[in-house]
Amino acid sequence: MARVTVEDCIDKVDNRFDLVLLAAHRARMISSGSQLTIDRDNDKNPVVSLREIAEQTVSPEDLKEELVHSLQKFVEVDEPEQDTVPLIGSAGASVDADDTEVALERMTEEELLKGLEGLAPPEEQPEEDE
């Protein structure tokens, strides 16, 4: 990059590193087909972008915003949450409350033994080779 062009831009963009980022982004935009705001004069895209910044035909603030948007891969959209969704802590408490309300049928040992006598053991099946 031509030193004269960088020196011309320093009063428009205070930080040299920011200037390089903005000029490189503008040069990429020019390479991808963006309209030039000044005559090319047989200069390459980085020099043209620096001349555009120096002559204030493009705004450094707009370039910075476009640079940030070009680097974003995911745009987060804030959506309001539904109020009807129960909280995890309150859901656990309601499950415990439901467990205590269930009435279990009590069986005596004799009733259990009678029920087990009626069950037939499963028949053993010979193993078949596949």
Swiss-Prot record:
One of its GO terms (molecular function) is DNA-directed RNA polymerase activity. The keyword Transferase applies. It comes from Rhodopseudomonas palustris (strain HaA2). Pfam families: RNA_pol_Rpb6. Promotes RNA polymerase assembly. Latches the N- and C-terminal regions of the beta' subunit thereby facilitating its interaction with the beta and alpha subunits. Keywords: DNA-directed RNA polymerase, Nucleotidyltransferase, Transcription, Transferase. GO terms for cellular component: DNA-directed RNA polymerase complex. The gene is rpoZ. Coiled coil: none annotated. The RNAP catalytic core consists of 2 alpha, 1 beta, 1 beta' and 1 omega subunit. When a sigma factor is associated with the core the holoenzyme is formed, which can initiate transcription. One of its GO terms (biological process) is DNA-templated transcription. The keyword Plastid does not apply. Gene3D superfamilies: 3.90.940.10. InterPro entries: DNA-dir_RNA_pol_omega, Pol_omega/Rpo6/RPB6, RPB6/omega-like_sf. This is DNA-directed RNA polymerase subunit omega. Belongs to the RNA polymerase subunit omega family. It catalyses: RNA(n) + a ribonucleoside 5'-triphosphate = RNA(n+1) + diphosphate. It comes from the Bacteria. Its EC number is 2.7.7.6. SUPFAM superfamilies: RPB6/omega subunit-like. Residues 110-130 are annotated as: Disordered. It is an enzyme of class 2 (transferase).
